[in-house]
Amino acid sequence: MISIQEQDLNIKQKDKKSIKCVVWDLDNTLWHGVLLEDQEVSLRENIINLIHTLDNRGILQSIASKNDYATTITKLEEFGLTKYFLYPQINWSSKASSLQEIAKSLNIGMDAIAFIDDQLFELEEVKFTCPEILCINADEIGDILDMPIMNPRFITEDSRIRRLMYISDIERQNAEKEFIGTTDEFLATLNMNFTISSAQEEDLQRAEELTLRTNQLNTTGYTYSYDELNSFRQSENHKLLIASLEDKYGSYGKIGLILIECQPQSWTIKLLLMSCRVMSRGVGTIMLNHVMSLAQKNDVRLLAEFVPNDRNRMMYISYKFAGFKEVEKNGNSVIFENDLTRIQAVPAYVKFQVID
């Protein structure tokens, strides 16, 4: 048996901030018995409460099970659990390949996944193929809710409805696959409403959560606590802006954050981040151009810090696409500057609102 204590987790695993998705095996894990062999299977004790609690904490869940798809879905429907599992991988592929597919579909890093299985072979195969993933033996299911990595500091409104927001994303993706036309033509059908506002005290829990959860679309990787963000919010030398997005399928929630350090002659973007769920919606460009417009109106230079890592290449491209140029390198960090000569208009298909 592999225990949490016995795993020789690499540094990334030890330092990871939170689990975004728990992936369940089924036979002798989620339920007692083997579905295709036993006359009946029964849910593991307290499993429904565990699933509900993880869901309420904003931790997504999925399945990686070697089973017959139709039979398995029917059984999950009998138990009333189907709706809790996003992109379930029920097939005869390796567990590692199923986990890779789930990470790709959810657009999250492999190190944001925990995998639960009762079979030592399956756990070892995943550990070898995907060492970033946290592997948990089914015998330790009772301890999961007490693990720090499964306990976000705050449970926000966005946390509580995260699964529902992902379900809306699936509807959008299906609609996009079926749409005949250009990307812009499809985006125009969404009736997007994008709002940027000065962060209020009630936004800070979600703002902290964004800095902790967002790795791919984060320009510096900086994380800030609730108290630090509250200090920035009240500071005359900083602007803390938060962005939200909704469309005809529903709300994406609060999906973007910008921290600007304001000096008399120059502003510096210390942090720009957005949820991976809105990567293809063009809102990063709108956020940047809004800040550029503010800097122009205040007659200040606009700088931006960027700290590259193995995930945030897209944010580097976003800066370059918006006309930012490298003016300085300091160790691993890059300083960009924008001359504010080509501020792009908000696309006609987005209703844009600014709330001071």
Identify the residue ranges that each predicted region occupies:
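Short, contiguous acidic/charged loop-to-helix segments that flank catalytic cores in large enzymes
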Residues: L35-E45, I90-W92, A199, L217-G221, ...
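Non-catalytic pre-domain segments flanking phosphatase-related domains
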Residues: M1-W24
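Asp-based phosphoryl-transfer active-site loop
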Residues: I19-L35
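Short amphipathic alpha-helix that is part of the acyltransferase structural core
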Residues: N191-T223
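Conserved Lys-Pro-Asp/Glu-containing loop-to-beta segment of HAD-superfamily phosphomonoesterases
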Residues: L99-L120, V126
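Acyl-donor binding region in acyl/amide transferases
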Residues: L245, K254-K329
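Substrate-recognition element of Asp-dependent hydrolases with the DxDx(T/V) motif
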Residues: I47-E77, P88-S93, R206, T220-Y224, ...
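Terminal substrate-recognition subdomain of acyl/acetyltransferases
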Residues: S105, K127, I133-L190, S293-D356
